């Protein structure tokens, strides 16, 4: 039995109906769970002797509003965690979708893996995903006065405001963005024998 098959069987046995979907692609397993089961599943993944995912390596937010070749018809925001079992030497990706696209809220994993602290803060800062139960959920990389969440696909590339140092006021000031959007149309120039190809 292959290593992924052993992990898949252990996940199905330990989690039962909590497994919403289990996807195998490129030699990795992705476990999809519902937000209501997320915290309980995380504890089982850590504590069950047949699984023993001792480490959370990473957690990131994802905006699926424009995913793949067309419009995404599922829930918009997800948190994706990368887990590692040192005991069994295997990895697992866990994906959970926030049930509300307008105000995405998911349970915090801080009580399961305390190393998730800054990862959840980053997902909050960039995507606006609120992690319920997080002890210090505030921006981590953008400025305190930053408006919006810059990794959302509907966030304008130029942003809303720009900041600069004003020598007259001797301080940093914020002002509306002065960049005018423009359309750039690429041109393709074809030359005979370009690159030595006929």
UniProtKB/Swiss-Prot annotation:
The keyword NAD applies. Keywords: Cell inner membrane, Cell membrane, Membrane, NAD, Quinone, Translocase, Transport, Ubiquinone. It comes from the Bacteria. SUPFAM superfamilies: Nqo5-like. It catalyses: a quinone + NADH + 5 H(+)(in) = a quinol + NAD(+) + 4 H(+)(out). It is an enzyme of class 7 (translocase). It is a peripheral membrane protein. Signal peptide: none annotated. Its main location: membrane. GO terms for molecular function: NADH dehydrogenase (ubiquinone) activity; NADH:ubiquinone reductase (non-electrogenic) activity; quinone binding. Its EC number is 7.1.1.-. Pfam families: Complex1_30kDa. The keyword Acetylation does not apply. One of its GO terms (cellular component) is plasma membrane. It is found in: Cell inner membrane. HAMAP family: NDH1_NuoC. NDH-1 shuttles electrons from NADH, via FMN and iron-sulfur (Fe-S) centers, to quinones in the respiratory chain. The immediate electron acceptor for the enzyme in this species is believed to be ubiquinone. Couples the redox reaction to proton translocation (for every two electrons transferred, four hydrogen ions are translocated across the cytoplasmic membrane), and thus conserves the redox energy in a proton gradient. NCBIfam families: NuoC_fam (TIGR01961), PRK06074.1-1 (NF004730). NDH-1 is composed of 14 different subunits. Subunits NuoB, C, D, E, F, and G constitute the peripheral sector of the complex. Belongs to the complex I 30 kDa subunit family. This is NADH-quinone oxidoreductase subunit C. It comes from Cupriavidus necator (strain ATCC 17699 / DSM 428 / KCTC 22496 / NCIMB 10442 / H16 / Stanier 337). The gene is nuoC.
